[in-house]
């Protein structure tokens, strides 16, 4: 037997089968930074339209987790895709560097500021710690393949940024949005500080739920108002009961609130009268285990306004007041009101000029002058409050109650609502809420439900407490009058003076400032504010401190992209401060992604053992697998990740890599400038392949523009596996391997492969950037050193509508091929044939389909990958033929059988002319021509 292997054009490439990503990616990464790829890309796009994605700063504490990886990869995909669109896309990463978590880490090592270490040294240690965390996170983000200005990130602790945060505060003060007040705020006793809304998490908690009698001091007045005819005056006891799950707040009670428009009834039982909301009588009396009662009077809540009640255990009268916040969701329809311990209570208390009493210290302990409970922690005092109520005869009912309660995000402990002197951004004083609601409507929200979510949050939120009683942060650099508490009338000028000093020396410039340096003789009248700003203010004003400041950026940014929890966090703090500065949103578009969960939908946690660390994935599978998983996930919902899911992603990656390798291997010996065939001269099947890529590129680009990356993954994967792997690449192997090296048949095919590869490498580049770079290096022809410097490939072209071998033609051929393959599979299962080339097929077709298939002539067999394929009229179909159904009358009948002809050892086709040539007795006539003659001519496939 002769060996004809040397006569075949076998595939050959240096592109390895295995990605070995964990080893190769760091090497490629080093190359990117040695050649300043990001800088070159910026220079390449200079002067082009700009697209600005503003990076929401992660917190500079701890290793990056899978959520960080998702966020940064999504941003990087968008930036690289927009760059492919031809935009100038600067990416300036940032970090949030102030705040409590860093303070707590430093406290563990150095002790508390002002105790074991000076405040200055403490802040220095915080700065040093934050810088070390930034360095660690930066390397991991770079390792993910995220391209950006990593040498010049923005840090909220940079001196200039700290100064600009102050300037932004000054602008917001100037517009009248900042107020000072003694108001209830979320307070963590463990932190010793107020908390922002975004720092509050809701967890299940069991609390004592109690119904408490507030005795009516003037029963005759109740008789008169409710028309009771003396029932109240005659009763032994008359009360309005409240229901609460926070007994510890009762010492601060100042009133009982009713809804003005609700109907209330007076219920009589035994020798007692109770006033209850009509809708809640049944549930309340069931709670009190009273079956035998009667309704003796009715009135609206408004009628009872001003009725005097007795505090259940303090020597204090409290009034009945009216509030729209009272509901009938539960309880009694009467709400215990402590303005020092709740936002609704505070608001209604202001209307009635009630005292805002707060008997609780910052550590959660009752103040020394608190009757009955002095020195006790509020939560530990709950049982004692209940006992005292029972002792005084004020307790109607008591039971444990499981409910959702706010907890500190850091300590995971229940928080307090506690009135303290704080600085606030007022939502309504100067129209901020109104302007914010208007600005929201001008933003493009992805997904669309994001708009309704942030609208409801902004519409319902209280004023924003921006002050914190901590050490590590940007100071609220105000001087306030010692007597009135009012800010200095020249605060705007003074803030700028402080900002200039902070720009030189950091926040210590304020903390160590002698007021006389700026105020002169006025220093005696004023004192420095020692509070610092909420870190959400720091990150919220990056539209002013970063976007406005850096020449390559702009405000509004085109896109903010973060997790869906940021509707109540960064998206909102950015919106409010931007409205406070310039009355517009800081972003044109907002994109949110869901959280990561495991395969079963469970939240990631160390205790469950289901945490997927991005560092481990990169060190084993490679960053491109992580990037492909992100792209393949529908990030608008929760994103499931596990070792099993990543393994399946790696399998999909291998299929795409193998497709790329096949393309590259079959471009061996092809130089586009020399060998590329003009579109009109290409074989119809090759033009079809380019057309498929052309159509796909349109869809891919549209999906990138709509941020639908999972669709890109599905489409490109499907193209590789079905269009290419399942059809085109299978069909062209014969032509590619067996025809003459420089024949039109082969060069046409290589031209198609080249066009497809040029498109594919760019579609993949934003997603699996490392692999795309590797493909790029192995493509033939002159090219830049990085695919990331490129724009979308413009060499793809569509099929002409008038082409007899147009899209409709190939759709029908593919349908025929699918029907033939099903029958061949049956023959294979029946052990009649092995490979499809062992088969011969006869197709009996209706006239229209026959006319189409006849266009391919003898080359139909190459499309079907059978040794023979004949097309005949449907009427001639033998009874043993099989019906193959089709759409629109395109069904046909098929007869398939094993070929009886000998096999050509070179092309493996079974042909009647094998052995007809004395010099090549093992070859078919076609192969003889390709080896020794002029070579075969292909017209179609």
UniProtKB/Swiss-Prot annotation:
Keyword Ligase in record: yes
E.C. designation(s): 6.1.1.5
Cofactor(s) this protein requires: Zn(2+)
Record-level Gene Ontology MF annotations: aminoacyl-tRNA deacylase activity; ATP binding; isoleucine-tRNA ligase activity; tRNA binding; zinc ion binding
Domain of life: Bacteria
Sequence positions that bind L-isoleucyl-5'-AMP: 562
GO BP terms, alphabetized: isoleucyl-tRNA aminoacylation
Motif 'KMSKS' region boundaries: 603-607
Binding site for ATP: 606
UniProt keyword annotation of Iron present: no
Keywords: Aminoacyl-tRNA synthetase, ATP-binding, Cytoplasm, Ligase, Metal-binding, Nucleotide-binding, Protein biosynthesis, Zinc
Cofactor note: Binds 1 zinc ion per subunit.
Gene Ontology CC terms: cytosol
Binding positions for Zn(2+) per the UniProt entry: 904, 907, 924, 927
Reaction(s) the record says it catalyses: tRNA(Ile) + L-isoleucine + ATP = L-isoleucyl-tRNA(Ile) + AMP + diphosphate
Compartments in which it is found: Cytoplasm
Enzyme class, first EC level, given as a word: ligase
Coiled-coil residues: none
Motif mapping: 'HIGH' region: 58-68
Domain remarks: IleRS has two distinct active sites: one for aminoacylation and one for editing. The misactivated valine is translocated from the active site to the editing site, which sterically excludes the correctly activated isoleucine. The single editing site contains two valyl binding pockets, one specific for each substrate (Val-AMP or Val-tRNA(Ile)).
Reported function: Catalyzes the attachment of isoleucine to tRNA(Ile). As IleRS can inadvertently accommodate and process structurally similar amino acids such as valine, to avoid such errors it has two additional distinct tRNA(Ile)-dependent editing activities. One activity is designated as 'pretransfer' editing and involves the hydrolysis of activated Val-AMP. The other activity is designated 'posttransfer' editing and involves deacylation of mischarged Val-tRNA(Ile).
Quaternary structure and interacting proteins, as annotated: Monomer.
Family membership noted in the UniProt record: Belongs to the class-I aminoacyl-tRNA synthetase family. IleS type 1 subfamily.
HAMAP family according to UniProt: Ile_tRNA_synth_type1 (MF_02002)
Descriptive protein name: Isoleucine--tRNA ligase
Organism from which the protein derives: Alkalilimnicola ehrlichii (strain ATCC BAA-1101 / DSM 17681 / MLHE-1)
Record gene name: ileS
């Amino acid at each position: 037997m002769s060996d004809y292997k040397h006569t075949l054009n076998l595939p050959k490439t240096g592109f390895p089968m295995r990605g070995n990503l964990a080893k190769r990616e760091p090497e490629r990464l080093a190359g990117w930074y040695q050649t300043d790829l990001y800088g070159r890309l910026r220079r390449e796009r200079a002067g082009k339209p700009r697209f600005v994605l503003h990076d929401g700063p992660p917190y500079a504490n701890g290793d990056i987790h899978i959520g960080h990886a998702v966020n940064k990869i999504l941003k990087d995909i968008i930036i690289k895709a927009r760059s492919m669109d031809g935009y100038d896309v600067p990416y300036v990463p940032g970090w949030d560097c102030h705040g409590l978590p860093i303070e707590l880490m430093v406290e563990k090592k150095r002790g508390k500021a002002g105790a074991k270490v000076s405040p200055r040294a403490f802040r220095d240690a915080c700065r040093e710690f934050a810088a070390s965390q930034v360095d660690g996170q930066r390397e991991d983000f770079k390792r993910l393949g995220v391209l950006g200005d990593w040498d010049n990130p923005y840090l909220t602790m940079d001196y200039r940024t700290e100064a600009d945060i102050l300037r932004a505060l000054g602008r917001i003060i100037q517009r009248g949005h900042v107020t000072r007040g003694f108001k209830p705020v979320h307070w963590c006793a463990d932190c010793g500080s107020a908390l922002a809304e975004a720092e509050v998490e809701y967890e299940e908690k069991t609390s004592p739920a109690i119904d408490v009698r507030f005795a009516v001091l003037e029963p005759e007045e109740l008789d008169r108002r409710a028309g009771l005819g003396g029932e109240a005056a005659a009763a032994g006891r008359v009360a309005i009961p409240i229901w609460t799950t926070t007994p510890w707040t009762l010492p601060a009670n100042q009133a009982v609130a009713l809804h003005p428009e609700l109907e209330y009834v007076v219920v009589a039982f035994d020798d007692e009268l109770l006033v209850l909301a009509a809708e809640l009588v049944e549930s309340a009396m069931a709670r009190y285990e009273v079956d035998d009662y009667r309704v003796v009077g009715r009135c609206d809540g408004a009628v009872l306004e001003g009725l005097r009640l007795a505090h259940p255990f303090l020597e204090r009268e409290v009034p009945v007041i009216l509030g729209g916040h009272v509901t009938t969701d539960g309880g009694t329809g009467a709400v215990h009101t402590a303005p020092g311990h709740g936002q609704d209570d505070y608001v209604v208390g202001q209307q009635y000029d009630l005292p805002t009493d707060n008997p609780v210290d910052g550590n959660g302990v009752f103040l020394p002058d608190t009757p009955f409970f002095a020195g006790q922690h509020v939560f530990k005092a709950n049982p004692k409050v209940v006992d005292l109520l029972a002792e005084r005869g004020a307790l109607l009912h008591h039971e444990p109650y499981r409910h959702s309660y706010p907890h500190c995000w850091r300590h995971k402990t229940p928080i307090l609502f506690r009135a303290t002197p704080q600085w606030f951004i007022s939502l309504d004083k100067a129209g901020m809420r109104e302007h914010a609601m208007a600005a929201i409507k001008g933003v493009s929200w992805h997904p669309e439900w994001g708009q309704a979510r942030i609208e409801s949050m902004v519409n319902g939120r209280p004023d924003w407490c921006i002050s914190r009683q901590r050490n590590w942060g940007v100071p609220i650099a105000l001087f306030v009058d010692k007597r009135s508490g009012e800010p200095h009338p020249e605060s705007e000028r003074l803030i700028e003076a402080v900002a200039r000093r902070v720009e030189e020396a950091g926040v210590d410039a304020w903390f160590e400032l002698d007021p006389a340096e700026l105020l002169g003789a006025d220093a005696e009248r004023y004192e420095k504010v020692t509070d610092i700003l909420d870190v959400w203010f720091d990150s919220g004003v990056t539209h002013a401190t970063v976007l406005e400041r850096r020449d390559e950026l702009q405000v509004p940014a085109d896109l903010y992209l973060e997790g869906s929890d940021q509707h109540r966090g960064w998206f909102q703090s950015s919106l409010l401060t931007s409205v406070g500065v310039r009355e517009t949103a800081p972003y044109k578009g907002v994109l949110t992604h869901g959280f990561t969960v495991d395969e079963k939908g469970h939240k990631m946690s160390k205790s469950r053992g289901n945490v997927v660390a991005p560092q481990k994935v990169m060190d084993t599978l490679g960053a491109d697998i992580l990037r492909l998983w992100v792209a393949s996930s529908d990030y608008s919902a929760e994103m499931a990740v596990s070792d099993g899911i990543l393994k399946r992603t790696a399998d999909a990656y291998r299929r795409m890599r193998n497709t790329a390798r096949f393309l590259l291997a079959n471009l061996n010996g092809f130089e586009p400038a020399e060998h590329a065939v003009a579109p009109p001269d290409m074989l119809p099947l090759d033009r079809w392949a380019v057309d498929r890529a052309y159509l796909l590129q349109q869809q891919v680009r549209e999906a990138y523009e709509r941020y639908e990356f999972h669709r890109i993954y599905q489409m490109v994967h499907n193209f590789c596996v079905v269009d290419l792997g399942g059809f085109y690449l299978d069909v062209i192997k014969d032509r590619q391997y067996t025809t003459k090296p420089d024949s039109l048949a082969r060069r046409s095919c290589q031209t198609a492969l080249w066009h497809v590869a040029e498109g594919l490498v760019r579609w993949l580049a934003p997603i699996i950037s490392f692999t795309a770079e590797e493909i790029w290096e192995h493509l033939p022809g002159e090219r830049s050193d990085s695919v990331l410097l490129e724009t979308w490939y413009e060499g793809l072209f569509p099929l002409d509508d008038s082409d007899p071998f147009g899209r409709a033609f190939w759709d029908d051929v593919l349908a025929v091929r699918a029907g033939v393959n099903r029958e061949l599979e049956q023959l294979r299962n029946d052990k009649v044939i092995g490979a499809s080339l062992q088969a011969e097929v006869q197709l009996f077709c209706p006239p229209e389909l026959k006319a189409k298939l006849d266009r391919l002539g003898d080359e139909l067999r190459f499309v079907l990958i059978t040794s023979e394929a004949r097309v005949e009229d449907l009427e001639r179909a033998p009874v043993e033929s099989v019906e193959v159904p089709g759409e629109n009358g395109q069904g046909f009948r098929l007869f398939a059988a094993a070929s009886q002809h000998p096999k050509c050892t070179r092309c493996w086709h079974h042909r009647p002319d094998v052995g007809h040539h004395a010099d090549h007795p093992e070859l078919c006539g076609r192969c003889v021509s390709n080896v020794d003659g002029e070579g075969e001519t292909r017209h179609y496939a």
